[in-house]
Each structure stands twice: as C-alpha cells, then as structure tokens.
C-alpha cells in the first residue's frame, strides 16, 4: 500500500471535495454515546511569512494574510479555535525587524473572530535566536492542550538550528503520553514533517523517527504540519500526516524538480496554491474531515 495519497485519490474517497481521514481505531459504543455531541472543527493556517517581499512570487504579500483572516471570519460557522502551524513571519537577521514583524502579525490575526488562537513557531520565527523573540510575543515553543476529548500536542522542531526536537523535549513528550490511555485521541501539531519527506530539501526532522516511535504506542494519532507550502498526505504505520498550504507562496511537489524554489506568481491564476483548511473532528467516528479553502481568487 502506498504511503502517499494525492488530491485526486482523496476526492474519490470524499466525493464532495471534503477529504475524510480515518485516524486509528473506532471508539467503543459507550465512549461514542458519551462523546457524541462533542464533535467540533478548527482552522489550520500555516506559513504566513509576514514581512516577505517578492513581487515575482506574491505581489499581494501585504494582503494575503488579511484575506485569510477575512475568509475565516466569513465562514458560515465559526471554528472553535484557529491554529497557526509556524513560519508566522519571514526570517531576518535584524532583531528589531524580527520583533516588528511579529507585532504586526499579532495585530492582524487579532481580528479573527474566534475565542482562541494558538501559535507555534517555524524556523523563520525561531531558528536564528532559538525562539527568544517568538516567546516574547506568543509564549511557549511546545505545549499541550485538551479539547473535547482530544489531546493536542504542539511540538517544536525548529528552534534548534539542526532541525531536531531534542532529547529534553522528547522526554517531555514521552512523559506526557504516559499520562493518557493508549486509545486516546491525539493530534500532534508541528511545523516540519516528522518523517523524511525530502531531507535534501530540509523537509524532515532529524530525530523525527524517535518521535514517531513514541507516538506509535498510541492507537489514534494524527499529525498536522506546515513547512512544505502544499497539501500533502502520508502514513507512517497507522499515523496520518497532513501538510497544509501556505498563505504566501507555493512550493513544488517533493522531488518534482531538481532544486526547491518558490513557484512564481501567475497573473492568469492569482493565488493558486495558497489556502487554509477546516478540520472537523468527528469524535464518534474517529475521523477528521479536512476541507481546503483558497486565499483570494485561487483557481
């Protein structure tokens, strides 16, 4: 069986343009009855790169994040929370500019009409200063939270310049997961892929295999991540990994070109490849429905 699933395959499964992913095993009838009213959905945005300037790549670089915020606010039903999976800002060596960009980003996303907005860093936010500026604006680099029966784990695989989670954080993860049942629903939020998608393109986590080995001990695990600026779906054993699009620029499919490079802006198809997603957590059926939304006038 293939580990990778393309968009056409997913649409065949979903039928109506909403991809449905089964995560782990179904819950018991008693557990279903207990939680049947607790299904919910949230929004994932990623790789907003506030501060990027490149008219050949995105002539609307000052507008796409604002368009994404407006699109989320215009959804028929507001999500219970929004999560940004890293690269909130464009990297810079200037300490002041770095903080200015983070402040501007924070001001823009404060316009989201949701109760809770959660953040995590990307390498553009945290690798140059090991997350010092990021923590001033957004808090912890890694943490957990629980929502309606699902345990969310936010992992930092970017503040270490070697693209590692690190021994200390791995021990923290192992201790955290020991405190919950093996059949608990777990969603891991991270920036880089935990598996070796394309290591020569920096699409991997150096010690990701150790993280996956830890997660494999639990039956219901799903990973949502960013970094690769495109929708991508992969399985490691029973663990599903789903990458999100960027709101700033698209990147080519892994291995499709000799060298990774930003896809130039096409005036005939503005905003193509840019977007965000809704994730509906269906607790009773142990599934996640992922629906992709465009930014701007995407084709």
Residue ranges and their predicted role:
Residues 47, 86-87, 122-123, 191, ...:
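Active-site glycine-centered loops adjacent to acidic/histidine catalytic or metal-binding residues
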Residues 50, 90, 125, 194, ...:
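Short active-site segment of divalent metal-dependent hydrolases/proteases
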Residues 13-14, 29-99, 175, 182, ...:
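N-terminal active-site segment of His-dependent metallophosphoesterases
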Residues 1-21:
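N-terminal secretory signal peptides and thylakoid transit peptides that target proteins
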Residues 34, 93-185, 203-222, 228, ...:
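Extended active-site neighborhood of metal-dependent phosphoesterases/phosphodiesterases
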Residues 290-299:
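C-terminal/domain-terminus segments
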Residues 181-197:
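Short acidic, glycine-rich surface-loop motifs adjacent to enzyme active sites
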């Amino acid at each position: 069986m293939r580990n990778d699933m393309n968009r056409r395959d997913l649409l065949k499964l979903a039928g109506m343009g909403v991809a449905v992913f089964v995560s782990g095993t179904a819950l018991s009838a008693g557990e279903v009855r207990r939680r049947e009213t607790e299904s919910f959905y949230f929004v994932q945005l990623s790789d907003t790169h506030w501060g990027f300037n490149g008219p050949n790549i995105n002539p609307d670089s000052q507008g796409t994040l604002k368009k994404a915020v407006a699109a989320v606010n215009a959804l028929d039903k507001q999500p219970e929370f929004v999560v940004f999976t890293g690269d909130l800002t464009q990297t810079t060596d200037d300490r002041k500019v770095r903080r200015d960009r983070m402040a501007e980003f924070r001001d823009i996303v404060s316009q989201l009409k949701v109760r809770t907005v959660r953040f995590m860093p990307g390498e553009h936010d945290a690798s140059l200063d090991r997350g010092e500026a990021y923590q001033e604006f957004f808090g912890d680099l890694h943490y957990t939270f629980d929502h309606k029966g699902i345990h969310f784990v936010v992992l930092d695989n970017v503040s270490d310049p070697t693209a590692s989670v690190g021994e200390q954080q791995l021990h923290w993860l192992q201790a955290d997961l020991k405190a919950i049942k093996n059949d608990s629903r777990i969603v891991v939020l991270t920036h880089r892929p935990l598996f070796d998608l394309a290591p020569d393109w920096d699409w991997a986590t150096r010690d990701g295999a150790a993280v996956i080995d830890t997660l494999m001990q639990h039956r219901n695990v799903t990973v949502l991540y960013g970094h690769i600026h495109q929708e991508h779906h992969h399985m490691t054993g029973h663990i599903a990994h789903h990458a999100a699009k960027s709101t700033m620029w698209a990147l080519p499919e892994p291995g499709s070109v000799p060298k990774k490079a930003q896809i130039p802006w096409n005036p005939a198809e503005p905003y193509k490849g840019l977007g965000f997603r809704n994730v509906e957590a269906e607790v009773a059926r142990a599934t996640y429905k992922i629906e992709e939304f465009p930014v701007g006038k995407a084709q």
